A protein has these predicted regions:
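Pre-P-loop entry segment of helicase/translocase ATPase cores
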Residues: 1-60, 320
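Metal-dependent catalytic core segments for phosphate chemistry
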Residues: 17, 332-347
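Walker A/P-loop
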Residues: 58-78
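Conserved Walker A/P-loop ATP-binding site and its immediately adjacent core
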Residues: 89-110
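Inter-Walker segment of RecA-like/P-loop motor cores
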Residues: 107-158
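ASCE P-loop NTPase helicase motor core
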Residues: 112-114, 122, 167-265
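Conserved Walker B
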Residues: 164-166, 333
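ATPase catalytic-site recognition across NTP-hydrolyzing enzymes
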Residues: 242-332, 336
Length: 347
């Protein structure tokens, strides 16, 4: 038997280590739910396992979730999975405000890092303040937060996440944020002409609660739902109402029941925020919401005199413009209701 030199022993050991790394990386890429359990020490609910598995498979993902379902936490987990297993990933989280997007990074810093020593060893630096929100990994992956505004131009991303996308301006999304995806992650195998054609597709994800059907967010949700049935595309669209939160013990049923009995309870708001339903025109309605919404011009509301006696700021009614006509309309509810006042008064 020929004895190996010290160099051959070292190379053999390195080769075995790298082969093991490649094997486990392939396994965890194909099974992100197992990565969460083994690497991040997070036990996901069944619906969360399904969601994160589909997030890993798709190129386009839309998730309409009820409040309290934990979409920010799930987004934080997915970002860590992507950053660790795909070195050099540029992950951008865009939202209407920087604080909203920073919640994902805070979930990583405050909840995931303390429970996973392995994740802690992967992270090089965490910076979260008023001007910068970024997590840098030792493998050159970066998770960064940007404000969804025209000033965000110039960014690049292999994964673009729009948090509460219904609050983002459509023009900013199309002309600024989507242009971030003009970037291709360049792993080492891309330098080999044999594998140069195996470039990875970038991903874009839209997370939000529901809103009105006249809004562009509903059109995007419908498009993703239709494309999900096209076998030539990798689209996924999910909607989970508050019943899922109750089923998985993320929300107490009694809490929802108490909310529904309060005098300030809003049926429309509840359907959007808790049932994850987009609200459209009521059947038989004379005017659609879009028809009325396009005519809204008043920024500051008019208050009844008996409501503003102790509030001088509210007493300052908007000045009447030249040629302006003000019409008072009253919609009287013909059926009595003890729970709420269905009358509507507008100017």
């Amino acid at each position: 038997m020929v004895k190996k030199t010290a160099r051959e022993v070292t190379e053999d050991k390195t080769s075995r280590i790298m082969n093991a790394v490649a094997l486990w990386a392939s396994f965890y890429r194909a099974n992100p739910q197992r990565f969460c359990k083994d690497y991040l020490n997070v036990n996901l609910k069944m619906f969360q396992q399904i969601l994160i598995y589909c997030m890993a498979l798709c190129t386009n993902f839309c998730f309409i979730a009820a409040r309290g379902l934990g979409k920010t936490f799930l987004c934080a987990i997915f970002c860590c999975w992507k950053a660790i297993l795909y070195p050099g990933s540029l992950i951008v989280i865009a939202s209407k405000t920087r604080n909203q997007g920073s919640l994902v990074l805070k979930k990583i810093e405050q909840e995931l890092v303390p429970r996973s020593p392995l994740l802690r060893s992967e992270i090089k630096d965490i910076t979260i303040n008023q001007s910068v929100a970024k997590i840098t990994f030792r493998n050159d992956s970066v998770i960064e937060v940007v404000t969804a505004a025209d000033t965000a131009r110039g960014g690049r991303a292999s994964l673009l996440i729009i948090d509460e996308y219904r609050m983002v301006d459509k023009e900013v999304l199309d002309l600024v944020l989507k242009k971030f995806l003009n970037y291709i992650r360049h792993p080492g195998y891309m330098d080999n002409p044999k594998y140069a054609h195996l470039a990875e597709r970038n991903q874009q994800m839209y997370l939000s609660s529901a809103w009105f059907e006249q809004h562009w967010s509903w059109d995007l949700c419908k498009d993703y739902f239709v494309n999900m049935f096209d076998t030539t595309k990798n689209y996924y669209c999910f909607r989970f109402p508050y019943q899922m939160s109750i089923k998985e013990n993320l929300l107490l049923k009694s809490q929802v029941e108490d909310e529904m009995t309060e005098s300030t309870f809003s049926d429309i708001r509840f359907r959007m925020e808790n049932e994850a339903l987009f609200i459209g025109t009521t059947d038989g309605g004379l005017f659609s919401f879009d028809d009325i919404n396009k005519q809204r011009r008043i920024i500051k509301a008019f208050y009844a005199p008996n409501m503003i006696l102790n509030n001088k700021a509210a007493c300052q009614l908007p000045a009447k413009k030249t040629g302006e006509k003000r019409i008072l309309t009253v919609d009287i509810a013909l059926m009595s209701s003890k729970r709420r006042d269905n009358d509507a008064t507008s100017i």
